[in-house]
């Protein structure tokens, strides 16, 4: 979900230039049969993590200064049969784990992540470029996601079926259980490299499945460290395998007949390709959005400005529910615009490890360059630049536009960058019409003190979630998360992902 909506297009995510200050400490070199797959204390043996190959390792660089952080071994697509054999064993082991054991593993991993909070946060900063403040919040969300998954493992086991509600079935009784699907392929993006992995692994483990995980090649170390915590908490090693590679590997991982579900978070082009290649499988797709926030004349003004600034520029705008289009009622437009621009100019962009940095780098210099090009295209089409559009390598300063033509690509496609567009509207009907304009829709927000207006907007805006008196980017990890229209298939949120990753089995006893 970078400029032009290519967040996890597989060809793009292999090659961007990356970096940070100093490499994370490395372990001593292991013997050839136990080569490290990661950096620092993230190393695992190939038998436990993935297959050793002769392919060139995948280098991982910091988005801030391009320095080398380490590398991961590439997985050869030709090894898919061996990978599947491991996953097959993992699925059998996982389905036979008692629910209390699945729950204790997830709870134990949550405690480990929490106790190693600073180490996890620093890895997120180094490989993803989030500010240290934002990285700490992601770690806390990961802990919560794992705890919610542990609770789901214990309570969502099925229901009694009232067979005697049907004439002629008075002597029948029974229930349905929620059984595992089996093998799930999970593909995760770079923008939330820890918590979005937890959102796939946690419910899958709770449901008794095995997972073939492919994290973004740009941010693999958060995922590796999380898998390490799960195994340390008692998860059998075969239950999760991690692979690193490109389009050919992903195609092999999703096309295999034994894979029963593909869970993907990323770009539209890749999502379409996956849906064509997957065949008869369950699909869970979170393909992004183009979030509108409506600001009404009667809103709490300071709260609206603060919420919209945060919603637009959190994580350098690399947030699928971040505010991209802020629609302001006409009487308030000039005042809001001036206050919003003034607040935006106060944001500090720079080194993400500094506590006072508000906006870190984008994931790569190439992505920042594409963002700059998209903004310049909008300006050429008639948009007015209010601030920003200044790039230093991968650091793209917060950018605000007004007067963006509604036919412009920037208006219709997901920006996935620290870029926001302001536009006035007269009536609520017009604001809702503008909010619903793009094809992509995850979240929206509205600021108003009129409950009837808020509920009218919530009813008519075509999105998966409407945040009232909040920016569009609010998310609680237990709620259903997904979009309307073209933007997604299925829902994340622990309970809802768990239900997607399990299948009902009916047991009926005839006592007659």
Curated annotation (Swiss-Prot):
InterPro entries: Ald_DH/histidinol_DH (IPR016161), Ald_DH_C (IPR016163), Ald_DH_CS_GLU (IPR029510), Ald_DH_N (IPR016162), Aldehyde_DH_dom (IPR015590), ALDH-related_metabolic_enz (IPR051020). Gene3D superfamilies: Aldehyde Dehydrogenase, Chain A, domain 1, Aldehyde Dehydrogenase, Chain A, domain 2. Residues 14-41 are annotated as: Disordered. Pathway: Amino-acid degradation; 4-aminobutanoate degradation. PANTHER family: ALDEHYDE DEHYDROGENASE. Could be a succinate-semialdehyde dehydrogenase (NADP(+)). This is Putative aldehyde-dehydrogenase-like protein y4uC. It comes from Sinorhizobium fredii (strain NBRC 101917 / NGR234).
